Amino acid sequence: MNSFMAIALIWMMIACAEADKPLRDPGMTGFQTCKDTLKLPVLEVLPGGGWDNLRNIDMGRVIDLTYTNCKTTEDGQYIIPDEVYTIPQKESNLEMNSEIRDSWVNYQSTTSFSINTELSLFSKVNGKFSTEFQRMKTLQVKDQAVTTRVQVRNRIYTVKNSPTSELSFGFTNALMDICDQLEKNQTKMATYLAELLVLNYGTHVITSVDAGAALVQEDHIRSSFLLDNQNSENTVTASAGIAFLNIVNFKVETDHTSQTLLTKSYLSNRTNSRVQSFGGIPFYPGITLETWQKGITNHLVAIDRAGLPLHFFIKPDKLPGLPGGLVKKLSKTVETAVRHYYTFNTHPGCTNVDSPNFNFQANMEDDSCDAKVTNFTFGGLYQECTELSGDALCQNLEQKNLLTGDFSCPSGYTPVHLLSQTHEEGYSRLECKKKCTLKIFCKTVCEDVFRVAKAQFRAYWCVATGQVPDNSGLLFGGLFTDKSINPMTNAQSCPAGYIPLNLFESLKVCVSLDYELGYKFSVPFGGFFSCIMGNPLVNSDTAKDIGAPSLKKCPGGFSQHLAVISDGCQVSYCVKAGIFTGGSLLPVRLPPYTKPPLMSQVATNTVIVTSSETARSWIKDPQTNQWKLGEPLELHKAMTVIHGDGNGMSGGEAAGVTLGVIIALGIVITLAIYSTRKYKKEKEYQEIEEQESLVGSFATDASPPNGEQDPCPA
């Protein structure tokens, strides 16, 4: 009987557990559950990720992806996230084309063409730091070659992102960190965090991808071969196509003799060749086009991408928990960080390889190819410094002009203010102070205290205001920093006979006064300019009138080069075009460019944001740090805490007074209770003593005298 009841009890417990079990276990949600349920592969080519449009690489995920509904493509072949939809290509889209790229300026990416042509930012440098582009440019310039590209493309799906998709958790948290700094008026820290956001999530967000596969052959042939066949570019592209089809064992029905001659001539002028397979099965020598195409299924990749800039997705509807005005400020901060990334990687110069002013490092034309060089005189430079707080920093920041021995320019020259910034250095020192208890028991306590020393430096260089005597200025021998080399020496050093002068925090400018021995190492100098100050040497009118705004560019015949990025400000210098252009292409300059403050300044804790447009107020909960739309009563309470009541008492003062009154009342009540209890105890003791004395006296009076008998015996 007992065993039967035990079995029944266990059965009831199992039944209850099954009844309470949810339809979908939250721990098992995701694409793995969908794969196990539907027995289908997951589509891996998805939009919603960050994209670096300079390097053409995928970055961190911006749009969140979930697989709650186990959606599939319309043809039922792949599992897709809830936030995307696909447009299947109902017909076969096998494309084959052949093209000539006679200049790297007209570069088009194989797998990122659409997003590289997006025009909202500096589109001229889109893709210019990708591996594909840098290989093409280097081979074209070094080998004096042109590029032919033959490709077969098979597009299976177009995958698009839903407009109602939410931002990913990591991206949202990064935005909230920036917002927190903006609320506290910590602009510099917010800029630093925005630059980190660009480093991690790129410049754009992919909104659409073409999923499929592509087989591409890129050849580099001598430019002379194209010139010899100038009237028949079709002949060159046909030769490239035949060479490609021979690789994939595709039979071409043309005249065998002419085909052989074309192919031999083409191959004899080929300096470099590469075949790439994007998607499908890996390419190998002897593979047929048919075999490669059959292997595309389950090997899909992105063969084209489209998208929008990162800040386009920072909108109030994507961040409903933040005030609209704060979201706009956040979006602008991120947009500025993206623009800095583009600006610091834009290298203006002559892009015509046939010009003597050609600049191999340039990625944007600046019309300097035909300009004539004007000789300018360099009047030196100097840097002033003012201590603001802490230890002495100016001894490493001050620099006197070599020509004057002072913080000034020579006669006939005028100073040009390049930049003013604040330099910070942290230091710690032992500080001791006396701590006392009840002003009697005292001891000396010592501890290491971290402090920040600050100094402001102001950098100047000297430009001639008119005609100056020959050999009166300084010779310029390049410059370098602790992170870059001097192109004149290919090292962090100056040429022989040159002296390094300090500028900004880490820049060393090489100069010389020796016109006999130092001249062979000098280069024609065309001035400096920065993010706040232009170059007065750009034209004669500006040079005569220093008070007029100067253009931030180099004079004709000079090319622009980066000197340093000083705490988010780019400083450039100009030398004769065609110089400092050798070597390999410059790598991309990644953010952050702004230095985070060593210690945060006194922050303003914003708790109320009022919009004049919508007449609504947002209140920040001090406990959760979350924003919410404020009700009238909550708004009144918040305003009372911030501004105090009508008598001018602040929230902190009111709280202090209240606490003091409570403590005082507590002390009074405690003393009253103690006094009452003490009084009661004393009264009780007094009553007991009186009773005892009465009993004693009564007993004495009742006892008979000695020798007398009781008159009433029993």
Curated annotation (Swiss-Prot):
Q: Residue numbers for the site described as Cleavage?
A: N352, V353, N357, F358, N359, F360, K628, L629
Gene Ontology cellular-component annotations: cytoplasmic vesicle; endolysosome; phagocytic vesicle; phagocytic vesicle membrane; phagolysosome membrane
Q: What topology does it adopt in the membrane? A: Multi-pass membrane protein
Transmembrane ranges, per UniProt, are 113-120, 127-132, 235-244, 248-256, 654-674
PTM annotation: Proteolytically processed in two steps to generate the Macrophage-expressed gene 1 protein, processed form: cleaved by trypsin in proximity of the helical transmembrane domain releases the ectodomain into the lysosomal lumen to orient the pore-forming domain toward the endogenous membranes, and processed by the asparagine endopeptidase (LGMN). Proteolytic processing in antigen-containing vesicles is pH-dependent. Monoubiquitinated in response to bacterial infection; ubiquitination is required for vesicular localization and antibacterial activity and can be blocked by bacterial cell cycle inhibiting factor (cif).
Task: Write out the ranges of the annotated region (P2).
Answer: 410-653
Q: Which residues form the signal peptide?
A: 1-19
Known role: Pore-forming protein involved in both innate and adaptive immunity. Plays a central role in antigen cross-presentation in dendritic cells by forming a pore in antigen-containing compartments, thereby promoting delivery of antigens for cross-presentation. Also involved in innate immune response following bacterial infection; shows antibacterial activity against a wide spectrum of Gram-positive, Gram-negative and acid-fast bacteria.
What family, per the record?
Belongs to the MPEG1 family.
Reproduce the free-text note on domains from the UniProt record: The MACPF domain includes the central machinery of pore formation: acidification causes a significant structural rearrangement, leading to oligomerization and deployment of the transmembrane beta-strands (named TMH1 and TMH2) that enter the membrane as amphipathic beta-hairpins. The P2 region contains beta-hairpins to interact with target membranes.
Q: What is this protein called?
A: Macrophage-expressed gene 1 protein
Gene label: Mpeg1
